[in-house]
Amino acid sequence: MRLSQLLVPTLREIPAEAEIPSHILMLKAALMRKLASGVYIYLPLGQRVLRKVEQIVREEMDRAGSQEVLMSALIPAELLKESGRWDVFGPEMFKLKDRNERDFCLGPTHEEVFTDLIRNEVKSYRQLPLILYQIQTKFRDERRPRFGVMRSREFIMKDAYSFDVDWEGLDKSFNKMYEAYCRIFDRCGLKYLVVEADSGAMGGKDSKEFMVISSIGEAVIAYCDNCGYAANEEKAECLINQEIVEEMLPKEEVYTPNVRTIEELVNFLGITPNKFVKTLIYKAKDNVVAALVRGDRDLNETKLLNILGIREEELELADASIVEKVTGAKVGFAGPIGLKGEVMIIVDNEIPQMRNFIVGANETDYHIKNVNYGRDFKADVVADIKNVIEGDKCPRCGSPLKIDRGIEVGHIFKLGTKYSDALGAKYVDEEGNEKPIIMGCYGIGINRTVAAIIEQHHDEKGIIWPMSVAPYHVIIVPVNVSNEAQNRVAEDIYAALQKEGIEVLIDDRDLRAGVKFNDADLLGIPIRITVGKKVDDGIVEIKLRENEEAEEVKISDVVEKVKNIIKEKM
């Protein structure tokens, strides 16, 4: 392809809306343009990269025995009402009515549609196991679209669903998809962790996320270098110190005038935060919940939601009037002793192993010292409701955990019979008995994968595409298009590479060499062939985008050299 004919309007300045490297570079390198908040259109180079990633996904899904289909993006409300999810998604789901006032949505996900297909088409155990997948556009009305395609309102996703006769079959399908995902992300040139995760609104269990380590990632990951344990913040656990050597002391009320926060208490009492227990009052649907965690910990609301069995929008911190009603004190002095009315107390599993900690007294301007679980108060539920922190002990081997940030590019989990029960997807077994089909779900964000690749493969000059997903493998840059010899050699190499089936760009624009080199670096094409002054000596220059060194090569050897580089890098 000739650069003079390609729609590639590169930008010199950083767009004001862009905050992270992938967003900045996808705009500067003319991969995409913004149409509306969280909505993007893809230009030729961006489309080629998307197709490259999709092709890798297709090859590995097909290799794993999955079959490609294409479902409708427009989904009738009846299907989601059958599963009970019409209201679960809340305002994130784009809802609309047709001219007959029939409710539809733009698909945020497709569990119900796949299950509906299978309940109508699969009747016997002889038709199972089965894995189907699609690459389709999804729609979610994000409250705050940000970071370009990392969190957008329209995105391309590969979603697959497995259908088996039993859990043993699901385990096999799950492992096939796990291995396929590893191959996909390896081929895309990504460094990633596979972490234990929460299934969220999709339901199911044995949930794993494929996380690309990145400082701009929205997810927090805990992992262990020693044994390989990894989990996202919503699922991460740690070992609790079981050894209690301190004796219980008599509890004592302490006057703490206008001292409300942990930080203020630390300064006022001169005691470290891990000796405090904070009590957070929540409104959970129609109930009031007191959730207790250690003073230096953050409460994990996803863990709390799972314990309560309610949706995210049904849980919120209680307002001042509710806090004052159940504690009898102003905000900042809540504690577990003497709460008024029906309050469910949920205590983090670390607290029963603590001794002589400090809590709010449920009395304005007072706290209580030397409080102990069991002696002074009890809980309705003791469970893990905290976020782990750097240095916590790994739940598997006891080594210190590390904390990092990551970008979720893939998610696999076992749905079981959640949707087959709800929609009546059954099969007849060998004995003639009807049984629910056992399902699994497997998703990859295509656009997000592209952005994650850029996050891991860029420098101050631009993108550094891995060969497997690069829009073109080679860019030829004649330094001076007015020089007949340079033009002739550049065109000859261009034709020879095309003949070999190599994806090649030629920068035939009448621009200064520096501008061309800058664009080549910005676009991130893996191999640059520079045709310059040494052309009369039969020499051109080959430079790989991933490093600074250039190599002089005989013109007669260029094609073979390029073929070998591509073979090595693919």
UniProtKB/Swiss-Prot annotation:
Keywords: Aminoacyl-tRNA synthetase, ATP-binding, Cytoplasm, Ligase, Nucleotide-binding, Protein biosynthesis. InterPro entries: aa-tRNA-synt_IIb, aa-tRNA-synth_II, aa-tRNA-synth_II/BPL/LPL, Anticodon-bd, Anticodon-bd_dom_sf, Pro-tRNA-ligase_IIa, Pro-tRNA-synth_IIa_bac-type, Pro-tRNA-Synthase_IIa_type1. Its main location: cytoplasm. Pfam families: HGTP_anticodon, tRNA-synt_2b, tRNA_edit. The keyword Transit peptide does not apply. It is an enzyme of class 6 (ligase). SUPFAM superfamilies: Class II aaRS ABD-related (SSF52954), Class II aaRS and biotin synthetases (SSF55681), YbaK/ProRS associated domain (SSF55826). Its EC number is 6.1.1.15. It comes from the Bacteria. It is found in: Cytoplasm. One of its GO terms (cellular component) is cytosol. It catalyses: tRNA(Pro) + L-proline + ATP = L-prolyl-tRNA(Pro) + AMP + diphosphate. One of its GO terms (molecular function) is catalytic activity, acting on a protein. GO terms for biological process: prolyl-tRNA aminoacylation. Homodimer. Catalyzes the attachment of proline to tRNA(Pro) in a two-step reaction: proline is first activated by ATP to form Pro-AMP and then transferred to the acceptor end of tRNA(Pro). As ProRS can inadvertently accommodate and process non-cognate amino acids such as alanine and cysteine, to avoid such errors it has two additional distinct editing activities against alanine. One activity is designated as 'pretransfer' editing and involves the tRNA(Pro)-independent hydrolysis of activated Ala-AMP. Consists of three domains: the N-terminal catalytic domain, the editing domain and the C-terminal anticodon-binding domain. Belongs to the class-II aminoacyl-tRNA synthetase family. ProS type 1 subfamily. This is Proline--tRNA ligase. It comes from Thermoanaerobacter sp. (strain X514).
